[in-house]
Curated annotation (Swiss-Prot):
Entry's transmembrane regions: none
Localization terms from the record: Mitochondrion inner membrane
Gene: QCR7
Membership in a protein family: Belongs to the UQCRB/QCR7 family.
Domain of life: Eukaryota
A Pfam family recorded for this sequence: UCR_14kD
Record's protein name: Cytochrome b-c1 complex subunit 7
Organism name: Yarrowia lipolytica (strain CLIB 122 / E 150)
């Protein structure tokens, strides 16, 4: 599985290139439209797998209001799924509301993990 850091770097590369941007951005918007997570009230970052240690740490760093909103969206989507219905009206996540609220925290955690790994594997070389 790719790290969020590599995904962000790839997306920045795609957005910098006019040709790639013209091809990939409409495809991504179409994919998001047909994926259906917004019809359940989710934001895109709600779909990231939670079971990794980095994700657990990033979730703990969320502000309380954002954390409560995330749990509310998960509970509401579960209710929609159990009742075999989709959200209507105000419950649907609009594209302008679908922000990447969790990505900065994940990037910080991954950078810290990378730095920790680099320091843990540091080799001290004795000078002559």
């Amino acid at each position: 599985m790719a790290s969020i850091t590599s995904v962000v770097k790839t997306s920045e590369l795609i957005l910098k290139s006019p040709l790639l941007s013209k091809i990939v951005v409409p495809l991504a918007k179409t994919y998001v439209k047909f994926s259906g997570y917004r019809q359940l009230g989710f934001k895109m970052n709600d779909l990231i797998i939670e079971e990794t240690p980095n994700m657990q740490l990033a979730l703990r760093r969320l502000p309380p209001t954002e954390s409560y909103d995330r749990v509310y969206r998960l509970i509401r989507a579960t209710q929609f799924s159990l009742s075999h219905k989709l959200a209507t009206g105000n419950d649907i996540t609009k594209p302008e509301e679908d922000d990447h609220y969790l990505i900065p925290y994940i990037l910080d955690v991954e950078a810290e993990a990378f730095e920790k790994d680099a320091l843990d594997n540091l080799e001290v070389v004795k000078r002559k």
